[in-house]
Structures are given as C-alpha cells and as structure tokens.
Amino acid sequence: MNKRIKKTIIAILFIAIIMANSIFVYAENDLSVDAKASLIIEENSGKVIHEENSNIQNYPASVTKILTAILTLENCELTDTVTVSKTAISNIPSGYVIAPLFIGEQMSVEDLLYALMLKSANDAAYVLAEHVGGSVEGFSEMMNKKAEELGCKNSHFVNPNGIHNSDHYTTAYDMYLIAKYAMKNEKFVKIVSTYQHTLSATNKYSKNDRIMKNTNTFVNPSSRFYDENVKGIKTGTTLQAGNCLITSISKNGFDVITVILGARTSESKFSETKRMMNYVFDNYEYTEIHKKGDVIKKIEVEKATKETKSLNLVISDDIKAINNIKIKAEEIEPEINLRDEIIAPISKGQELGTIKYTVDGLEYNAKLLAENDVIKKTYYVEILIGVGVFLIILGVIIIIKKRHRKPKEKKSEW
C-alpha cells in the first residue's frame, strides 16, 4: 500500500512539474506589457508583433515633442536664430522641465531642438512653436494637419510639449506613425540618439554649462539599460499620462519601433520596453525564402521550338519574411498564379505570373519572369513533309488502282 501511495505522489509531482514548465513557457511567449497601451512594429515589413490597446486614446505627455521637432526641422534651418519671448517661458506650470531659457535670449534652432528632445525642455517647445507657427495655436494647427497627413485618426494636439490638457491626446498606433516618419529624417535621428549636448553661450547667458542630457537611458552609456542598437527616441511623463516611451532599435536585420503609453513608473517604462525588445529578438527572425533570380517553376510552352519549349520561371525580387522562429522556411507554401495562356514567342524577363507567400499573417509578393527567350515554332518544314507524305500516299493509291483495273472486253464480231 505504501509503495502504491509513493508511486501516486511521484506521479502527481511529475505532472505538476510538467504543467508548471508549460505555464512558464506560455507566459514568456504570450507578451503582456504593464502599461495602458503598448505596441511593437517592425518597420520594414509593417509586421505588428505585439499590441495592447494601441488604438485607445491616451495622453502622450512629452512624446508630443517628436511631432514638434519634425515640424521644426521641416520648416527651419538648424542655423536659424530664434529670440525667446516672454510668453514662451511664462506659460509653463511649476514642476515641468525647462532648459532654462531667458527672455530676449537668441539661440540657434539646433540648440533649441537638443534642449527639446534631450532634456525635454518645455520652454524650448514654446519658443520653437512661436517661431514656426507664429503662435502656439497656429503651431497646434500645423501639428494636427501633419498628424492627419501621416494617417493619425485618433489624435488631437493643442500644445507643442504635452503639458496636460484634456483635449490633447493620441494613441500608441498614431504615435508609431509619427515616430516612424520622424526617424526617416537624418537630422532628427542624430539629435535623439545623442546622449548629451552643451548649449552654446548666448547674449543672455555667457556660460557653457547648460548641459542637456537625454532622458532616454537607452542611449546613456553608464545606464544599466544602455543598448548600442537603440537609436532614440523620446520619453514622456505627466501625472495624467503616466510614463511614456517610444524607442527605435535596429538589430539582426530588424528596424523596430516600440511604444509604451502609461507605464506605472519611470523605471518600468524602460524595463518593459527592454522586455518588449527581447521578445522580438527571442521569438522572431528574418527568413530568406528566395533570392532574386531563383528558379521557381519549370513549364512547357505551347507552340515553341523543341530547343526552347522547356522554360524556367524565375522570381523578380528577393523575398525575406519576418516570422516566428517556430515557423520553418520549408513549411511555407507559396501560391502561384500563371497567365491563362503561355504561348511562344516569349521574351526573356517577360512577366508570366505571380507568386505569393503568406507568413505569420503578412503577404510577400513577387513576379514570375521568363528566364530566357522562347522561339515560336515554324511550320514550313512540317508542311513540306506533310505534302510529301500526301503525294507519296496519293501515288501509291494511283498505282494500286492501276494494277487492279480490269482490262476492257473486246466486242465479238458476227
């Protein structure tokens, strides 16, 4: 009886261990982010690797400044001089970050952008908004117009810095669209990937001690979150918005943008983003399915010469698919569609069909091209042979008929 009980206990423990391991693996792969909204998109493919509440409206806090910076870069030169107005620095509530700047101070657009995007200086945002849009209201109109152009459908901006306003909101997906657009601008990338920048001395401040340090610790070499593959881009925090972070990372052939809106703490926005990054690189890879020029299919062409009748169809472009590592390349089956009639003559490179791969929810398409020329078959020889055969047969028939023809009987004479 004791032996039987022991065996039962061992069996139960064994099953429990297996179940525990299974639950752990599932939890690791089923990513859930501790934030109000989160999103991971691989830029090159457009693959949505993860999303939670990505189309739910949230307050953006200082990630707003991404849009402010890109509008400034598109409407100004970095060397332009801007004068700081009284209104630009007098409308900032206490507790919000400032450079600081001084009334009447003349600064370059470049320095103001570094103050805006590294230290997250709210005074710099107002100064740039007045310079570019004529007023904060005018600049806000520009922001909303630009957001609409980029495809943002659930956003509305009323200021250039994200200082809380109930009518100032966005979504994780809309911020992805804005961030993706901004990261195509080399000047923008240079700024947001910089760890620190010293503002130049000015007419109102002669010292060179205003050091703007990036609030994004992923680009801080002394931070435990430092990652050399991260290219920026922006943090944001208000009481109402929570902790926000948009990050761009390039690694293993991936260009990934992650968005977190409303993380619980300042540190968790980084730790959760790091977990999101690890999830991508631990679970996804680029699979090279085909190289341009690979032979996909061999066909027989109608009305072609014997020498060129057999034709290889080659793929028009490389196909590299982002897919879950659980999916093997050899398991991916293509959908091939050829023209209804493929008849000679055919020119090398002529499109004869299409090929489509569906991998982990994404479609990858390419054309199928003729690898070489196909010559149309001529029928002169065949006709001559046919005529010759016909004449021979006709001659044989005539000869046979002559041989079997009965001689005419002579009439009897009486």
Task: Describe the predicted segments one by one.
Residues 152-153, 166-169, 173-414:
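Domain-terminus/edge residues, biased toward the C-terminal soluble/receptor-binding domains
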Residues 2-27, 384-402:
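Sec-dependent N-terminal signal peptides of Gram-positive bacterial secreted proteins and lipoproteins
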Residues 2, 102, 106, 110, ...:
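Juxtamembrane/transmembrane-helix boundary motifs in multi-pass membrane proteins
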Residues 6, 15, 19, 24, ...:
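Generic "edge-of-domain/loop-turn" microfeature
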Residues 19-20, 78, 203, 291:
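Residues in and immediately flanking transmembrane alpha helices
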Residues 25-186, 190:
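Active-site-adjacent loops and short helices of periplasmic peptidoglycan-processing enzymes
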